[in-house]
Amino acid sequence: MAKKIEAYIKLQVKSGSANPSPPVGPALGQKGVNIMEFCKAFNARTEKMEKGMPIPVVITVYSDRSFTFETKTPPASYLLLKAANLKSGSARPNTVKVGTIKRNAVQEIAELKAADMTGADVEAMTRTIEGTARSMGLVVED
């Protein structure tokens, strides 16, 4: 018989640096999950990734307090800022542009995020990522 699912917990944790401090500790502690077990497993799974990259993770907690987790691709905003070599986006994206990014870089990001996105094809996902770039104050060039 399958285990009964108790809860889903969605977090964004920096790769290779999960620890019991907030937000990980309180979120897992409320559900009775072994926090250190999650931290060790997450850090082991993300050790090959760039250190400090924010990784969305969905933790499935079962009624016997066991868990499984699934890591996603980094947020599009993080990947766009990294591709444009910027620290942050614009506070006023309609009036203040902070940088430019090439369309082929946007397409590479869309292909990387394809597993987590719901677009019909790569072209639609590329347009979605372009919209994210514009909302951050980036200009998309050909």
From Swiss-Prot:
Keywords: Methylation, Ribonucleoprotein, Ribosomal protein, RNA-binding, rRNA-binding. It comes from the Bacteria. The keyword rRNA-binding applies. InterPro entries: Ribosomal_uL11, Ribosomal_uL11_bac-typ, Ribosomal_uL11_C, Ribosomal_uL11_C_sf, Ribosomal_uL11_CS, Ribosomal_uL11_N, Ribosomal_uL11_N_sf. One of its GO terms (cellular component) is cytosolic large ribosomal subunit. GO terms for molecular function: large ribosomal subunit rRNA binding; structural constituent of ribosome. GO terms for biological process: translation. The keyword Magnesium does not apply. Pfam families: Ribosomal_L11, Ribosomal_L11_N. Forms part of the ribosomal stalk which helps the ribosome interact with GTP-bound translation factors. NCBIfam families: L11_bact. HAMAP family: Ribosomal_uL11. PANTHER family: 60S RIBOSOMAL PROTEIN L12, LARGE RIBOSOMAL SUBUNIT PROTEIN UL11M. Part of the ribosomal stalk of the 50S ribosomal subunit. Interacts with L10 and the large rRNA to form the base of the stalk. L10 forms an elongated spine to which L12 dimers bind in a sequential fashion forming a multimeric L10(L12)X complex. Belongs to the universal ribosomal protein uL11 family. This is Large ribosomal subunit protein uL11. It comes from Shewanella denitrificans (strain OS217 / ATCC BAA-1090 / DSM 15013). The gene is rplK.
